[in-house]
Structure formats: C-alpha cells, structure tokens
C-alpha cells in the first residue's frame, strides 16, 4: 500500500515551519522567520496556506505600539504533522 503523504506539509518550507511550531507552544513570526531563513513575504505566503488548511493559528496583536504576530499549531495541524511523520517513517522503511 502506498503511503499517503500530506503534500501541504511535504513542501520543504512548510515542513520547516511545522517542525518549528511542533516543539513550542507558540512562536513569534519573526522568530520563525529567523529559524527557517525564509523571507518575510515567503514565510507569510506559506503561513497563509497553513492557516487556510487550519493547521496553524495566526494571532495578530500589539505589544505596546508594536505589532506582533504569534503562530501556533492547531490540534488539526499537530495531528497532521504526527501523521506525516508516521507516513514518512513507513515510506522510508527498508523491505
């Protein structure tokens, strides 16, 4: 049986984003940008796709007068990443 790989997560930049968010409760947009070496626009585009899939929650707020964007995996996103990891492990097993 062929593994079912989530193509949304399989894209390298989105995989990096999901992996970063998987190990923390939440993260600031700029922190994720630095960790992944993505540009502001590129990260924003990938976050939009993950947000539309309900994998990531995006919360925009102000800290004092500074805008802040916090990112967090949703339960659906966490489950999808868990499943992706399982499918990749199965796909890479030697017969």
Regions found by a protein language model. Give the residues of each.
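Surface-exposed beta-strand edges and their flanking turn/coil or helix-capping segments
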Residues: 30-32, 44, 70-71, 84-88, ...
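Basic, amphipathic "hinge/linker" alpha-helix immediately C-terminal to the N-terminal HTH DNA-binding motif
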Residues: 63-82
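N-terminal helix-turn-helix DNA-binding core of bacterial DNA-binding proteins
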Residues: 4-42, 61-64, 70
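Short beta-strand "wing" residues that participate in macromolecule-binding interfaces
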Residues: 58
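Amphipathic alpha-helical dimerization/coiled-coil segments
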Residues: 2, 19, 79-95
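Glycine-centered, phosphate/nucleic-acid-interacting loop/turn motifs that mediate DNA/RNA or nucleotide
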Residues: 54
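Short, hydrophobic-biased segments on the C-terminal half of alpha helices
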Residues: 47-48
């Amino acid at each position: 049986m062929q593994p079912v790989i989530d193509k949304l997560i399989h894209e390298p930049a989105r995989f990096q984003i999901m992996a970063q968010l998987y190990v923390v409760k939440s993260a600031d947009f700029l922190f994720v940008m630095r960790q992944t070496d993505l540009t502001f626009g590129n990260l924003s585009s990938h976050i939009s796709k993950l947000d539309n899939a309900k994998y990531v929650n995006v919360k925009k707020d102000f800290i004092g007068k500074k805008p802040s964007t916090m990112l967090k995996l949703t339960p659906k996103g966490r489950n999808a990443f868990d499943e992706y990891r399982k499918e990749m492990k199965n796909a890479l097993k030697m017969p």
